[in-house]
Amino acid sequence: MGARASVLSGGKLDAWEKIRLRPGGKKKYRLKHLVWASRELERFALNPGLLETGEGCQQIMEQLQSTLKTGSEEIKSLYNTVATLYCVHQRIDVKDTKEALDKIEEIQNKSRQKTQQAAAAQQAAAATKNSSSVSQNYPIVQNAQGQMIHQAISPRTLNAWVKVIEEKAFSPEVIPMFSALSEGATPQDLNMMLNIVGGHQAAMQMLKDTINEEAADWDRVHPVHAGPIPPGQMREPRGSDIAGTTSTLQEQIGWMTSNPPIPVGDIYKRWIILGLNKIVRMYSPVSILDIRQGPKEPFRDYVDRFFKTLRAEQATQEVKNWMTETLLVQNANPDCKTILKALGPGATLEEMMTACQGVGGPSHKARVLAEAMSQATNSTAAIMMQRGNFKGQKRIKCFNCGKEGHLARNCRAPRKKGCWKCGKEGHQMKDCTERQANFLRENLAFPQGKAREFPSEQTRANSPTSRELRVWGGDKTLSETGAERQGIVSFSFPQITLWQRPVVTVRVGGQLKEALLDTGADDTVLEEINLPGKWKPKMIGGIGGFIKVRQYDQILIEICGKKAIGTILVGPTPVNIIGRNMLTQIGCTLNFPISPIETVPVKLKPGMDGPRVKQWPLTEEKIKALTEICKDMEKEGKILKIGPENPYNTPVFAIKKKDSTKWRKLVNFRELNKRTQDFWEVQLGIPHPAGLKKKKSVTVLDVGDAYFSVPLDEDFRKYTAFTIPSINNETPGIRYQYNVLPQGWKGSPAIFQSSMTKILEPFRTKNPEIVIYQYMDDLYVGSDLEIGQHRTKIEELREHLLKWGFTTPDKKHQKEPPFLWMGYELHPDKWTVQPIQLPDKESWTVNDIQKLVGKLNWASQIYPGIKVKQLCKLLRGAKALTDIVPLTAEAELELAENREILKEPVHGVYYDPSKDLIAEIQKQGQGQWTYQIYQEQYKNLKTGKYARIKSAHTNDVKQLTEAVQKIAQESIVIWGKTPKFRLPIQKETWEAWWTEYWQATWIPEWEFVNTPPLVKLWYQLETEPIVGAETFYVDGAANRETKKGKAGYVTDRGRQKVVSLTETTNQKTELQAIHLALQDSGSEVNIVTDSQYALGIIQAQPDKSESEIVNQIIEQLIQKDKVYLSWVPAHKGIGGNEQVDKLVSSGIRKVLFLDGIDKAQEEHEKYHSNWRAMASDFNLPPIVAKEIVASCDKCQLKGEAMHGQVDCSPGIWQLDCTHLEGKIIIVAVHVASGYIEAEVIPAETGQETAYFILKLAGRWPVKVVHTDNGSNFTSAAVKAACWWANIKQEFGIPYNPQSQGVVESMNKELKKIIGQVREQAEHLKTAVQMAVFIHNFKRKGGIGGYSAGERIIDMIATDIQTKELQKQITKIQNFRVYYRDNRDPIWKGPAKLLWKGEGAVVIQDNSDIKVVPRRKAKIIRDYGKQMAGDDCVAGGQDED
């Protein structure tokens, strides 16, 4: 039965069926396992034919072995099956799969040992690479001398990485893609990968933070060994070495290849992946548990969402496998879940998706119900049919195999791919437009009611690759209808395409049957049918194993009008099969009419239809020109005439070709382009001559009529319809559609590039010494062959292209230099851009300047020093293309300088891979930079300019780093490596900038070159507050409606200033306030702002800005000696900030609280905070906060809890147990503050209670616990715990709950909050902790207007301070004071010292309390004896 069953024959099949699947198991290998393995190999794009030999199996195992560690269970099963099959082929006697795997491992070990021995004997470089200690992956390889060398990461890899980030952003797929692309990379390579995506600053900052944390952890775990490093021994890497910031490439290679190795690349990669995981979690916050299939959601869409989320989950592969096996089925909708459970636990994903195809929604339910009802009423129907009531009632039929009598879900046959209704792949049954199942229709072989014809040679060039089954000598009637309609002579035999299953109606023994024409089957097998004559029993190998059949000989069968006599087997086959024994008799052949180019299938965007744009009127000469052009195109088969049945239309027009009287046809495909699917551009950019290697022989070819040589998808052609109108509507318009790729259609470039690559691939493989650069229809062909041999190869290439329908006209075949290619002029040893002529005009339009800038940009890649900034300034604003623009003096000067530069021709040289790349950058001023990339001084590979300003506020160092990144990225694309940079900036300046500013942990290798003007930082901010300098608290406020605002400052020295502003914003006022502070301060100043916006601008140390106020701030900063800038959060009661905020807010901030309403509502939905907490946290008026609480249905149960209780000693706690949902919750309340601690305990025992009290005492200062008389509180365990923790235990009055009033009321409050959040948590213990959090930190009120959490901390802190103060007071009372009053020179006293300050003391003399300056007081210790007289206050007792 087919090719897959013929992998083993004879004795090998017997041996195969004796091998057990598991050691000691009952199940053995069967033929179905080979069929499964063949299908799996096809799925993984491996040739199933390899299974037929031992060598083939060995090749498959080599391919699969590398994927075993990370692969799915299916891959492992496939490997096991192939390993067992290999043993059968090699006649190795094995009893089960495990024994087969052991044998394979033994063979591989022996083979490896032999290889290593051979390598040791020969000492060959190639053999050395097989050593396990050497990385066989890039970028560290071993050269012929045995040295470890670094092979740079390829530009293709880097381009792939850039595209991954651009396409996927930071979705879960990024992590496996990064892991695969960075296999074996060094830290330098990894940093290169990070650098080229450095534009994603937020993500890179997160990544940097993770790397820094991991590096710090590494340093802590791996401390530096004391003493010097022994000679010849490498130092141990630090965290920053692993991150590549403080280590050289050679050091990294040394660590990675030492014995034992330190895999710094893998360690750094692991850190990066940790960071990427955090980024992915931020971008994809959905949990796998939340992925559930919607009631009508297709199973395929659900699976896509499931696996996308699964990739983002942080779990091991085993856990992910478990999630796939369990959650995928568990979270499916009920309809799919029923089917999936019926499939059993071992079902593959493909089987699940096939089984669940078309499931879901009302149509599916109706169908299932109809099938169930038809099954239930079968017997009744049979009785009624006998009576003649229901003649010809339809029996139920299986969607899967087409047989009657059972349902698809009960079908034993293998699940059929494609739609269960029409048999076609590419859609599900629920989306099928056919009314009945196609694979049971009599005319399936000829779906359009006509036969396929052999295409003519011209048509074949433009038709899709097709595979057809032809039955020779059939009757004419089947094909003539279609032939007559199209007016084409057809062959007389039917042709059956293989785009669908080739099912035809055959007549056997006078009965009609649907049967599959199977050229892979030896025998003809039919399901149960009554045939005349004798039969013999027989066993045949089928798809599901062996089946028993009856063999009838010499049976007449009629297929497509042809008769044959042969053997027919009758048995329980899932599908009727006509095998080769009958097909050969009727002359049936399998034909492969290969069209030169396979068409690429194209579709419209989902839910869209083709364009229906009316044709606009055309002049007579344009209509005539278009008619002639279309006649020629029709003759060449490029377009096809169509009738009115095509409803689509796209407008067409004509323009005259440049410098010619000939016309050119243009079709406006703008509308079709909007509706066509998106395409992936196969080529990311154009090749650059600087990246070409110098070649002896070069040829440049052009492909003629490039697009018109590639066929368009047949199903899509109808959408390209256009109409050529007639003059004065004399006749209906002539309608055409394209057979080939149209000019101007969005899909043409991508499809052409893809087709061209496929066509050139065999030539490139056959001739590796020839380099072909391909961009659209331009081909550059270079080689180091002699010119004669080279030209022979060129002719071979032209013939190869011609076979595929591509012509290379002699007119554009360039054999001698200079070669004109892609806008460049190529010479044997140099290149330049094609000559550029700058126009000289009296007046310039916008269009003229745009073209001029384009030419200058093109020239800048080899002419150094080109500038366009002033010319670009002329184009600012929305201007029409024809508007006249006067040139400014600066623009005229810039244009004149550019003319001078372009006067002398400049050439670039070609790339030499053996030499280093060097990039040198010079500053041109006004934010413009020029650079040269060379390998030898004064021989530039290419030049360029950089003038892009990425932000409104910048400085030269920042622009220089952006230019470096741009040049590095450009170099990676062209040469696959970064150059060494020579920059006009001193190391000290660079370091000062980079230590403070953000970096992606990678700075390219560079050196200082003294090329004026040098880059410098014009000012530097201090990192610590300046001692002795005045501190300015600055703030600004603006009203959004009136645009009025205020800016001002207050200082720590009592100064303050406020200015009123008009037409301003909050951000401008914040900057204006900083400017005021800088204006009014001395040479050194501390400034404190609450604006992150202003802080961000100034901390980046800009030296130029588009904002006038920022430029004024920069001028002030340059004049200062020292400036310290700090930030504090706004509205948090911070001294000076609060004062200046009140100062600038008066009369301005009226509606600013509206900003906080949304955030407050969001927080209330999560925590159900009370109105005081929201008013405080979000700056809301009480009425607004109360309204939010009033609109919440969960907060309206019993009103809001009353707050405010007696201020008791801060050491007293009340404890109680309460019950909820059948569980016990123990609650402890801090009486003074209302702060609670609670948790669910397993039992109300003394042991659990004692443990809770000890936990409480470990967190807070507990002096007294007040409890009721419950047995758990009066237990010995609790008494022991209280004794140990020095806690006094008090008991309430029996049967009087009021003695436990505080904790009782808190129990009610806690249960109320639990009720509000219960649905957010799965378990009660989680809800309890959520409720504790909300009560302690999200509810404010009572003493001080604090939350309970703030209040307990404040009370404990106050208690400590009070005790400390009390100690100080006690000490102070041991002193006496003698003092002089006013101008009286007589000392008085002794008085009692109450308080001692910096400038004065407070004393009590008799009953009077006085304040005396320190200079007029003498403080002495009281020794218990009274001083004798007023003048006896001698110095020995003096305190100061």
From Swiss-Prot:
Ranges spanned by the short sequence motif Tryptophan repeat motif, renumbered to the chain: 990-1006
Region Interaction with Gp41, residue ranges: 7-31
Region (Interaction with host AP3D1): 12-19
Gene: gag-pol
Short motif (Nuclear localization signal): ranges: 26-32
UniProt-annotated binding residues for Mg(2+) 1: D702, D777, D778
Region (Dimerization of protease): 494-498, 542-548, 581-593
Regulation of catalytic or functional activity: Protease: The viral protease is inhibited by many synthetic protease inhibitors (PIs), such as amprenavir, atazanavir, indinavir, loprinavir, nelfinavir, ritonavir and saquinavir. Use of protease inhibitors in tritherapy regimens permit more ambitious therapeutic strategies. Reverse transcriptase/ribonuclease H: RT can be inhibited either by nucleoside RT inhibitors (NRTIs) or by non nucleoside RT inhibitors (NNRTIs).
Domain RNase H type-1: 1026-1149
Cross-referenced SUPFAM superfamilies: Acid proteases (SSF50630), DNA-binding domain of retroviral integrase (SSF50122), DNA/RNA polymerases (SSF56672), N-terminal Zn binding domain of HIV integrase (SSF46919), Retroviral matrix proteins (SSF47836), Retrovirus capsid dimerization domain-like (SSF47353), Retrovirus capsid protein, N-terminal core domain (SSF47943), Retrovirus zinc finger-like domains (SSF57756)
Cited Gene3D superfamilies: 1.10.10.200, 1.10.1200.30, 3.30.70.270, Acid Proteases, HIV Type 1 Reverse Transcriptase, subunit A, domain 1, Human Immunodeficiency Virus Type 1 Capsid Protein, Immunodeficiency lentiviruses, gag gene matrix protein p17, Integrase, C-terminal domain superfamily, retroviral
UniProt keyword terms in alphabetical order: Activation of host caspases by virus, AIDS, Aspartyl protease, Capsid protein, DNA integration, DNA recombination, DNA-binding, DNA-directed DNA polymerase, Endonuclease, Eukaryotic host gene expression shutoff by virus, Eukaryotic host translation shutoff by virus, Host cell membrane, Host cytoplasm, Host endosome, Host gene expression shutoff by virus, Host membrane, Host nucleus, Host-virus interaction, Hydrolase, Lipid-binding, Lipoprotein, Magnesium, Membrane, Metal-binding, Modulation of host cell apoptosis by virus, Multifunctional enzyme, Myristate, Nuclease, Nucleotidyltransferase, Phosphoprotein, Protease, Repeat, RNA-binding, RNA-directed DNA polymerase, Transferase, Viral genome integration, Viral nucleoprotein, Viral penetration into host nucleus, Viral release from host cell, Virion, Virion maturation, Virus entry into host cell, Zinc, Zinc-finger
Record's protein name: Gag-Pol polyprotein
GO CC annotations on file: host cell; host cell nucleus; host cell plasma membrane; host multivesicular body; membrane; viral nucleocapsid; virion membrane
Organism: Human immunodeficiency virus type 1 group M subtype A (isolate MAL) (HIV-1)
Cofactor dependence: Mg(2+)
Cofactor note: Binds 2 magnesium ions for reverse transcriptase polymerase activity. Binds 2 magnesium ions for ribonuclease H (RNase H) activity. Substrate-binding is a precondition for magnesium binding.
Modified residues (Phosphotyrosine): Y138
Lipid-substituted positions (N-myristoyl glycine): G2
